Amino acid sequence: MLGVGDTAPEVSAQNQHGETVTPAFERPTVVYFYPKDFTGGCTIEANEFEDALPEFRDADIEVYGVSLDDVETHADFAEEEGLSFDLLADPDGEVAAAFGIDTSEGYTARLTFVLADGEVVATYDPELADPSGHAREVLEETREAYV
């Protein structure tokens, strides 16, 4: 798994609208990996990122959610939950692999990376705790460090 100080990977994936997204990772960017759309903890986490999205945007911090779900599933999930940030579809696990995340179980672990200036600047493992409050923690720490 990538750690603090590692170079940001070059990745591209389709979002829930079928558009190809290639994050630059120059300005502060949050990439959070989650196991699966429409599951309890993942839905909580996505909604918390959505609720905090205006504050992320005010601080010029990008947010991307990534799972092994396909574009259509992401589109359904985003519509049902009212998510307006990009959910990147990674059905072949290429984005996860670029971050050093294991997908052998058919899903990714719940992991979050903050990238800026072309490198990883923070990592979070909310798998160790309830995902509630995770988005707020990431926002506050990233805003404090980079804004």
Residue map of PLM features:
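Chalcogenol-based redox active-site neighborhoods
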Residues: 1-147
